[in-house]
């Protein structure tokens, strides 16, 4: 996959990066054949995995009471459990479980009512509690925006969002009604951006006013929730250990972890490196890129995207959906302002990229995907934004805030340098381009 991708396949940015014989380290002519071989390898890997029992994970496989869950929670739990359920049916290759204890502590929002800040034991106890659920791994506002609408298309393409003014007013607020009670706390005021999103949005992210299934409460009518404003339980209450963006990485926190004011139980799990959903998306991408011409997208590309989307609740008959939105052609034709996008190779390239960003969000793939696509110079040079987490009331909290302006990501940053000591040991080594 890496060899076929733009970074290493016909990348003329590195035309002058050559060996001692003057030959480019990176081939200068694009080869479609590399994508053909990648597609063949992905298909072989899929067949091997499925033959040996791998299948897309469904939380009903492990949660004895999942059949009683409302659809909103069931499908959001599918994406959470795909990552955190130990040795589940989708896992192909993982790292050891060591480290996921700390990962979960640093990702978990403090959803247990802590003692009020004060003097003596009250302050100490509250601080300890917050250290068990620090929430410092903070997804960005851009991450929140990249998830689809409930119609399975990008929010900046969704005709319902555009014509109603919802997209332009997505940073304004509205009150949660009982219609959204499984995703957000009824009566809470939160951003318009948080309404009418796909299940993976609610399964991957916690935010001010969002419900948090499990972790001590599984009664769907009395769920934990995030109280993320300044001075509140999930927010900046102690001056440390809080999300600087206002978002939390719910996806990587196992739902059976239990945190109270006096104790903590965290179930470690092997963190996925490659899972079947990832492999399906690799295959769809490779098959699309291997196709000659711009209007001959193979049917299998749509088939494998459908598998991933439908597992996530993007399908007819779920959450009141009347259209077959598992098929991106149907979703875009019905709901997008760019209805022909899935019919072209270039359009499908864009769709597959976003599908990977959504499906694999918070799993450590996006940085390297952006590198191999040669999109990092644009995407990783953007300002990091979030909500104003120093705000105590809605009017102050829901203000988009620039938290960090990174230096520009340039051509040299796609490849890392060889350290000076190694160059001194072997004088025939050639330093990486730009360093």
Locate predicted features.
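Acidic/polar-rich alpha-helix caps and helix-coil junctions
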Residues: 1-130, 151-435
